[in-house]
Amino acid sequence: QNAVLQALAVLLHRKPKLLVFDVTPHEFVPFVIQSVAEWLGISVLFFQPCSMAPTMLARTNLRAVTSPKGAEVAASPIAREICAFMPQRLKLLIEGLDPKYIQQQRGRDETASSPFHLLKSVPATLSWLWKDRFPRSRDFTGHAGLDGVMGRLAKIILFRSLQSTLRGKVNSLGSRSLPLAPYCVLALHYEPERTSVPEGFPIDFQGDAVVHSRLLVPETNALVVKEHYSQQTSAMRGVAGRSPEFYDLVESMPNTWFAPTQSRLSELVSGAECVITLTGTVAIESVLRGVPVAYFGSPWWEGLPGTVRITDAFSYDDVRGLKLPDQGDVADFLDNLCSSPMIPGLAGESIETMEYRLGPLPQGFFDAVANSVSLCVRREMELT
């Protein structure tokens, strides 16, 4: 309530015509400000990143894309260099390889379990007795109020206990033999993150996604749920988005199974009758393997051939009746999407992270970003 009232007071005092966010508002304060602004009738502009190229969609809400003339990648002098990232990433999806960040997490988890690393981590752990590991605004452990040396010690112990319990539960998933065909796959997202909340709306709790999926899929079809590897990795705080009880809830549903968390999603997808996701790039992997996709949210790849958005009027026949593309169709769709309506940009991502995932950015990239963003802002200002 305080956050909403503060946002309301600031916006009423400042009276802006347009609010611009560098990325889809998903952290608490930006999300509240955006929601209050929309309620007041203030225009909003934000940028949704693409995971396969240094490009983004300019949006005025989760269901509306804006792309003024001259802002698209196609209008940039480095359009060819920017769009060249797409086929490189597409090749990895065709091969079914883990993305770089998952490979890095797997390697880090192996290292973190070694006695040498545990000994090496002692100084860092001791330092958290004197200074909180996470700032209060990002401490999602539920124990942010514990202060002092003893309070911080309790917080360290409690957090590690939560982390250990979750990891044990997640790594025990898939102990039952998976069902024979036919089955459908629901690929969960790491939570909390932008691609699930808010881009996965109207789903804001992935347990609801499981329930909806189970109701959509015929009773004779098994629903195989695949947890995201990142949810239990030592590098992330998966305890902020899941609890062991979540998995008990899912397993209590009829004809619903978990795949082993360590397994590759691409291998599971190949034998599925359909795949369901919020906004994940598993949709691209699936249609490349001849498997149709149903999705809930507002992904950057929306409109991909072989996919359909789940709405109130959706039925299972809608996904079964989809015409599936070949690899050339998928490549053409992504190339056209990259050219327009996408614009150059990182959408709040750091240069280091983007270059680690995709490779070096082309020369002149940030000039192209500045030009495109300024055109988008100017267009929205003219419309207000």
Annotate the PLM regions.
Residues 40-43, 221, 291:
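A short helix->loop->beta-strand "cap" motif at the edges of active sites that frequently abuts
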